[in-house]
Amino acid sequence: MKNVAIVGDGGHGKVIRELINARSDTRLAAVLDDKFKTFEGGKEWYTGPPKAVTELRRLIPDVLFLIAVGNNSVRKQLAERLGLGKDDFITLIHPSAIVSKSAVIGEGTVIMAGAIIQADARIGAHCIINTGAVAEHDNQISDYVHLSPRATLSGAVSVQEGAHVGTGASVIPQIIIGAWSIVGAGSAVIRSIPDRVTAAGAPARIISSIQTSNKG
């Protein structure tokens, strides 16, 4: 049984908790969030601020971590701030997800219920492949990406670091979604999208630039 600590106790964290409970090989060991000011042991799991990582590892040496925060930029900041190595993070896949044996999934990534990851897809670290999302064959998905529920990437799509593909959006084959860009919900992407823009509509068009650095 793998002991899992999640960092983040918002709505996304609730879903991660249920995913952990849905698996037969994981148990929730701790919830770390800034709203907890002190490190304490509860009836079922420990709670504390993110800085309690060191104390938690002393008590549970084999504990593995997952950053349960939906915001891509904040997730990157936490991954860098916690001072943990790649082997300290767990990859969580819901039992109902379908993942090709040839797919490669990075550390700290979560694959939610009903998601589909097809042949030779490559998914980076600390990504969220949300409920019912589809990453088709030969997709290249970089670190800190979020595919929202029912987002669909056709074959050989590339999604660069920190990009967010909105709920129900669809992307045709061989498109590139630029780093830290946002694709609006329900959009149909038929042309590649550059870095740090918001695109929406069917077909998707650039509607604004994103000025923040998102470098963590």
UniProtKB/Swiss-Prot annotation:
Q: Which residues are responsible for catalysis? A: 137
GO molecular-function term, one example from the UniProt record: acyltransferase activity
Query: What is expression of this protein induced or repressed by?
Result: Repressed by SinR.
Q: What reaction does this catalyse?
A: UDP-N-acetylbacillosamine + acetyl-CoA = UDP-N,N'-diacetylbacillosamine + CoA + H(+)
Q: Which InterPro entries match?
A: AcTrfase_PglD-like (IPR020019), Hexapep (IPR001451), Hexapep_transf_CS (IPR018357), PglD_N (IPR041561), Trans_hexapeptide_repeat (IPR050179), Trimer_LpxA-like_sf (IPR011004)
Summarize where acetyl-CoA binds, as residue positions: 146
- A Pfam cross-reference name: PglD_N
Null mutant phenotype: Insertion mutant shows decreased efficiency of biofilm formation. Disruption affects swarming motility.
Q: Mind telling me which SUPFAM superfamilies this protein's record contains?
A: Trimeric LpxA-like enzymes
Q: Which UniProt keywords apply?
A: Acyltransferase, Repeat, Transferase
Which PANTHER family does the record cross-reference, listed alphabetically? ACETYLTRANSFERASE, UDP-N-ACETYLBACILLOSAMINE N-ACETYLTRANSFERASE
Function text:
Catalyzes the conversion of UDP-2,4,6-trideoxy-2-acetamido-4-amino glucose to UDP-2,4,6-trideoxy-2,4-diacetamido glucose, commonly known as UDP-N,N'-diacetylbacillosamine (UDP-diNAcBac).
Q: What is this protein called?
A: UDP-N-acetylbacillosamine N-acetyltransferase
Its gene is: epsM
